[in-house]
Amino acid sequence: MSTHEQQADPVFDVDADRAAVREAVDAFLDAFRSGPESPQRLDRLRTLLLPQAVVIRTCGLDLGVYDVESFIAPREALLAGGSLVDFHEWSLAGRIDVFGDIAAWFGAYAKEGVHDGEPTAGRGMKSVQLVRTPEGWRISAVAWDDERPGLTLPHA
């Protein structure tokens, strides 16, 4: 085969890709759970996120733009520090789009726990962008916004 001949087109299994993307999104959300194993769950983000990934918080505030480490560090302190207990995040509903080696999950999520003795809860939307790597699907970017006065999710 000459260097100019193309190899056979790859076969994409969209159902398997959707399942793998869903697994990555679930692992991302599951990382935000308080308790003794929270450092291990958060550490998994270091392989789930590309090293150059960007994470952006909007929430009606000045943008919070984080690289991987600046995103993980304060969450490690909060989730393992004891002031936030019984905390977890989970998806409510979402849509997965896949095309070749790129994918996106856009969906609603919820969170709840007890912070400094007071119940806390919220909902919002997350946009998760993923790319296929030799190691599997990895997150390249995340952005989120939470409900607040004037901005609410429909019943999920």
Which residue stretches match the model-derived regions?
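Hydrophobic pocket/interface hotspot
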Residues: 28, 45, 53, 105, ...
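Short beta-strand edge/turn micro-motifs at domain boundaries
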Residues: 2-5, 104, 123-150
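Short, cysteine-centered beta-strand-loop-beta hairpins and adjacent loop/turn segments enriched
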Residues: 81-84, 111-121
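Hydrophobic/aromatic beta-strand elements that line small-molecule binding cavities or substrate pockets
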Residues: 91-96, 109-111, 125-131
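A short, polar/proline- and glycine-enriched secondary-structure boundary/capping micro-motif
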Residues: 67, 116-119, 148-156
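A solvent-exposed, acidic/Ser-Thr-rich amphipathic alpha-helical stretch
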Residues: 42-99
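A short hydrophobic beta-strand element
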Residues: 87, 99-111
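Short, low-complexity N-terminal intrinsically disordered segments enriched in polar/charged residues
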Residues: 1-48
